[in-house]
Amino acid sequence: GLQVSVIGFGGIPIRKLSMREAKNLLAEAVGAGINFFDTAQGYGDSERKMGEGLKEKRKECILATKSPCRTAGEAASHVRKALARLKTDSIDLYQIHHVSKAPELERVLSPGGALEGLIRQKKEGNIKHIGITGHNADLLYNALEQSEELETVQFPFNIIEDGKNERALLKIAKKLGVGTIIMKPLAGGVIPEPELCLRWILQQGVDVIIPGMILSTEIKMNSSLGDKLRPLSPQELSRLKAKVKPMEQDFCRRCLYCEPCPEGIPIYFIQELGDKVKISAVKDMCKEMYASLEKNAEDCTECGECEEKCPYELPIREMLKEKHRLLLES
């Protein structure tokens, strides 16, 4: 039902901009033909900036937000607050944010769960469409199998995170008519050759990609990809694969098989923060989030259980030490 630009606007980085800078950037994005704007309750003041920056162009834009609501009561409360922050009387797409484990999904889909609450919000006209997001493609596949009410699915997909679970999720989404929203198109900013990477993703039949943008040059380059959807040449594909091949050996694919850690260390979350801290726009945010954790990499007892469970045989203990160093250095 939603007619979206193939390149959307990922809303995390604008939390680093002033309100004036954010409004200018959002106006530029709309002017460049971008009409899908993704934000979240957990993205700092991103919702407020989008609400302010897009209010004059509201009819031209599709606003998508999300929250970690797990119950119907939380869903109602979160939607009400999001409406105020986004300065709108109806949100085009509201997603259940970051469903990563089976018990969470069960809670969300059960009577009294978040999905039931969002269905009620949809009937009341506060939201128009319902979606789900997460990093576990296999779990999201199960979610789509279990509920016909989910209209979109948002998940990481890129030339590194291109496994059988991601492909299966794309296939079932297409079969069911569920919209696919691709986050982490550059694997959290670590993949070089951004233009080639985005063009590769567009070749895979996805609906919209939402790279985070903070610069005018990024908007110009990314939006132009939607104007000329040309597949990668064999030479370009070879170049891209050569660039990412060294990264595949120690890249965390966020499958979560390593968890739970006996010591309560949020392994995957630390891996993600450690990758993102290299991006200047979110560097401080990542360090603050790491500092607020109850357990971090220093609490590792070297038991090795995580490495035994990792299907990619990653040296997780060494990776955590490196991420710890990156997240603490000035």
Residue ranges and their predicted role:
Residues 60-63, 149-157, 230-236:
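Short hydrophobic/aromatic-enriched beta-strand-loop microsegments
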Residues 9, 37, 50, 63, ...:
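Conserved, mostly hydrophobic/aromatic
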